[in-house]
């Protein structure tokens, strides 16, 4: 009994001592929370102060770093300045070109920074970030079209194996339409190379012998490509393509529409490989009553289905007038609707050229449409036998409008990129307009 009483008294003395000194706690106490994975390990209590914190801090304690100001994301690092500089050069060139056009009077003037240094210093974080993003997008558009171009920047082909190839050539007399037709085949701009070429004329006797010989030589030239060690590689299944001259009346015979008729000359040629039909000087015949529009839409699909070797079908038609009045059978109207390529000489009448540009540039800004008209007018003053080509179904959007030059080749105009750059100029114009409006409002309130 004495032992039990002494123990209870000792416990009471410890409780009184802890109540008298609330800062002092027993060195060992059951923890409030234990580790679920290690329930037997001793954990430090959550109640009271740490007796070790009063002295020297332990070497294992973590020191918090002082708060740093928020970083701005490297806005004007080297890459950002490179993007802005590259975009500024393009914007400045486009704006100078638009301002010097003869038709620039109707365009609204766009405000811009006077120099690159002013843009970098006064542009602001949001505008500069947008410009970096816009230039990245321009680079992406350039990289998308790069695989379709040669090393010198010219196009590898007109159709890039798109079938069928229905093309219309517009040009006045003496602009080089016949030479253009031969060049398209000899330079392999139309792929695949045809194995049989049908030359359609109003009368066979009106074709001069020199032109026939030129056709035979150039289609044979287009059938080969240079290979390694001075060799030549055939581009089709024949060593010598066939050249067949036909009169327009023979073309329109009924048996030439039926692919199952053994008398069909086109079906016999398509059984061996790709074919091409060239209609030169046939505008008056096309404007007659007899319809030949089957050659533009129904006939190609029938040939492709019946003859697997006919991997290419090309029809090129020459017109001296972009809007002929005589079209009794609707052949010319159907031809222009089904056409995949419109090849235009800059020497055409300006009113017809402007009407065509206005029709096929509805989705472009007005300034870019005027720029295209100025380009055509510029080449019309220089008789270089060059051509402007509009592709209704291009392989890439940058190739929709292109320029064919005897020396430079087929060069894309990149009107989609020019339209994008013009919209960037409009964005800068809106930013500067907003700043001027805010400045005027601030001054007006300050005066009041």
Curated annotation (Swiss-Prot):
Q: What induces it?
A: Expressed in the intermediate phase of the viral replicative cycle.
**SMART domains associated with the record:** AAA
- This protein is called Packaging protein 1
Q: Which residues are listed for ATP binding in this entry?
A: 171-178
Pfam families per record: Adeno_IVa2
GO terms (BP aspect): DNA-templated transcription; nuclear capsid assembly; regulation of DNA-templated transcription; viral DNA genome packaging via site-specific sequence recognition; viral release from host cell; viral transcription
- Residues covered by region (Disordered): 1-76
Polar residues compositional bias, start-end: 56-67
Q: Classify the main location.
A: virion
Q: Which InterPro entries match?
A: AAA+_ATPase, Adeno_IVa2, P-loop_NTPase
- HAMAP family found in the cross-reference section: ADV_PKG1
Q: Quick one: a GO cellular component term? A: host cell nucleoplasm
